Swiss-Prot record:
It comes from the Bacteria. It comes from Prochlorococcus marinus (strain MIT 9515). One of several proteins that assist in the late maturation steps of the functional core of the 30S ribosomal subunit. Associates with free 30S ribosomal subunits (but not with 30S subunits that are part of 70S ribosomes or polysomes). Required for efficient processing of 16S rRNA. May interact with the 5'-terminal helix region of 16S rRNA. GO terms for cellular component: cytosol. This is Ribosome-binding factor A. The gene is rbfA. Belongs to the RbfA family. It is found in: Cytoplasm. InterPro entries: KH_dom-like_a/b, RbfA, RbfA_dom_sf, Ribosome-bd_factorA_CS.
Length: 132
């Protein structure tokens, strides 16, 4: 049975170190020109695999390119992790797109549109009442 404390500790360490690697060690214009952050890390119970969820303000194809670039660089990132952290075996890394931020922004935009529409309808009703 996996030790949840150990998994949480390893996840936290990996998140910290991968964040530093993304900020300082990758020479990729696409990654440097777009704000990206690690939103979540999932490490398997045997510490063999790690999914890294990336959130970004970028949209559409740029988001896909960011994830593709990170997955192309995953062996390099794993190599640097191996030099920086003391683990018997560094987990296999997989980068995934975390669409929660984009979905949240989409919901906020819809709510704002609904609020504006309701406000416009209320204004029209008030104008009609004033004219009567």
């Amino acid at each position: 049975m996996p030790n949840n404390y150990r998994i949480a500790k390893v996840s936290s360490l990996l998140k910290k170190e991968i964040t530093l690697i993304l900020q300082n060690d990758l020479e990729n214009d696409l990654l440097r020109s777009n704000f990206i952050s690690i939103s979540k890390i999932e490490v398997t119970g045997d510490l063999q695999f790690c999914k890294i969820y990336i959130s970004s303000a970028a949209e559409g194809n740029i988001r896909k390119e960011i994830i593709e670039n990170l997955n192309l660089a995953k062996n390099y990132i794993k190599h640097i992790l191996g030099q920086r952290i003391e683990m018997r075996r560094v987990p296999e890394l997989t980068f995934k797109d975390d669409t929660a931020l984009a979905k949240g922004l989409s919901v906020l935009k819809l709510l704002e549109e609904l609020n504006n529409k309701t406000h416009n309808q209320n204004s029209q009703v008030e104008e009609n009442n004033d004219n009567v």
